[in-house]
Structures are given as structure tokens and as C-alpha cells.
């Protein structure tokens, strides 16, 4: 197999502090009754980490490169809009998404009740299987103090034929 045909892997990370005056969006879903996250767009850490992983795998940089905070059209943008545009950029660069996995890090909200719903939404948006998991830091650090949320993602892309 030549290097041009090898799959590529990307890693993405995103972190946002809580902002109680904003709605919480995670994995493209609204979480009523939970404090939101501060950010230029909707601050959906799950989708932002996924976008970073996809962009990294395709050699396209990261969210800041593609959707910078200096660009007003991305102000308060929905994570699903960013993800749809990211997938378009990845495809335009000549890649197809194989799959991705995202892990949400934080004490709350609890993902388990909405995991299937979130995975379905992400999978439909990307057009490839997306797995979602969660972990806590057992009370350690800013995540353990409930100051914010983080997410880490990996993505696999293949050259489109």
C-alpha cells in the first residue's frame, strides 16, 4: 500500500468553562437544566473535539484555523453547523471519514441517558460511525470542581477513491 492510500488518524481536544447564563449543548443536543459553556460558538465540546480530530486527520489544521473567533459568521454557531462544514472540508480535501470516537470529560451532565440519541445524531451528521463515551476525573482538577467540561476525540479518514 502506498503512503497516498494509507488511512490517516487525527486527535482533537476541546475545553470550555461553564457559563450558567448560556444553554448547554453537547453532542448536538440541548441539555435543559444544566449550565451552559462559554465560547465563541455554542461551545459544544463534544462536537468541537470531533471537528478538531477530523480536521487534523485530513491535514486541515483545527477549528481555530477554519472557523476563527475573528470571523463573525461563526459567532454563536451551532456545533452541528460546524461539524457539517468540517465534513465538507474533509471531503473536499479528498478524504472519506471511516469512524471516530469522542470521550466527554466532566462530572456532569451524565451522558448515559442520551448516549444513543447523541451517537445517532453525530453518525447521521458525519455519515460515518461515531462512538461516544464519558469519564470523570474523580473530583480532581477544574473538571472535578465542576468548572467546565472537556472532550477528546480520535478520527480515522481514508483517501477517497
UniProtKB/Swiss-Prot annotation:
Its EC number is 4.6.1.12. The keyword Metal-binding applies. Binds 1 divalent metal cation per subunit. Its cofactor is a divalent metal cation. GO terms for biological process: isopentenyl diphosphate biosynthetic process, methylerythritol 4-phosphate pathway; terpenoid biosynthetic process. Keywords: Isoprene biosynthesis, Lyase, Metal-binding. The record marks 40, 136 as: Transition state stabilizer. It comes from the Bacteria. PROSITE patterns: ISPF. A divalent metal cation binds at residues 14, 16, 48. 4-CDP-2-C-methyl-D-erythritol 2-phosphate binds at residues 14-16, 40-41, 62-64, 142, 145. It catalyses: 4-CDP-2-C-methyl-D-erythritol 2-phosphate = 2-C-methyl-D-erythritol 2,4-cyclic diphosphate + CMP. GO terms for molecular function: 2-C-methyl-D-erythritol 2,4-cyclodiphosphate synthase activity; metal ion binding. Pathway: Isoprenoid biosynthesis; isopentenyl diphosphate biosynthesis via DXP pathway; isopentenyl diphosphate from 1-deoxy-D-xylulose 5-phosphate: step 4/6. InterPro entries: MECDP_synthase, MECDP_synthase_CS, MECDP_synthase_sf. It holds the Pfam family YgbB. Involved in the biosynthesis of isopentenyl diphosphate (IPP) and dimethylallyl diphosphate (DMAPP), two major building blocks of isoprenoid compounds. Catalyzes the conversion of 4-diphosphocytidyl-2-C-methyl-D-erythritol 2-phosphate (CDP-ME2P) to 2-C-methyl-D-erythritol 2,4-cyclodiphosphate (ME-CPP) with a corresponding release of cytidine 5-monophosphate (CMP). Belongs to the IspF family. Homotrimer. This is 2-C-methyl-D-erythritol 2,4-cyclodiphosphate synthase.
Amino acid at each position: 500500500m502506498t503512503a497516498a492510500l494509507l488511512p490517516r488518524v487525527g486527535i482533537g481536544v476541546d475545553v470550555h468553562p461553564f457559563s450558567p447564563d448560556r444553554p448547554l449543548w453537547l453532542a448536538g443536543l440541548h441539555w435543559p437544566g444544566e449550565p451552559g459553556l462559554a465560547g465563541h460558538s455554542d461551545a459544544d465540546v463534544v462536537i468541537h473535539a470531533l471537528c478538531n480530530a477530523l480536521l487534523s486527520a485530513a491535514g486541515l489544521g483545527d477549528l481555530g484555523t477554519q472557523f476563527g473567533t475573528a470571523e463573525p459568521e461563526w459567532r454563536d454557531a451551532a456545533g452541528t453547523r460546524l461539524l457539517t462544514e468540517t465534513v465538507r472540508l474533509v471531503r473536499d480535501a479528498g478524504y472519506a471519514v471511516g469512524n471516530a470516537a469522542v470521550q466527554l470529560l466532566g462530572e456532569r451532565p451524565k451522558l448515559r441517558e442520551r448516549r444513543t440519541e447523541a451517537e445517532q445524531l453525530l453518525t447521521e451528521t458525519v455519515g460515518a460511525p461515531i462512538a461516544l463515551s464519558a469519564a470523570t476525573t474523580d473530583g480532581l482538577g477544574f473538571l472535578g470542581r465542576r468548572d467546565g467540561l472537556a472532550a477528546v476525540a480520535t478520527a480515522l479518514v481514508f483517501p477517497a477513491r
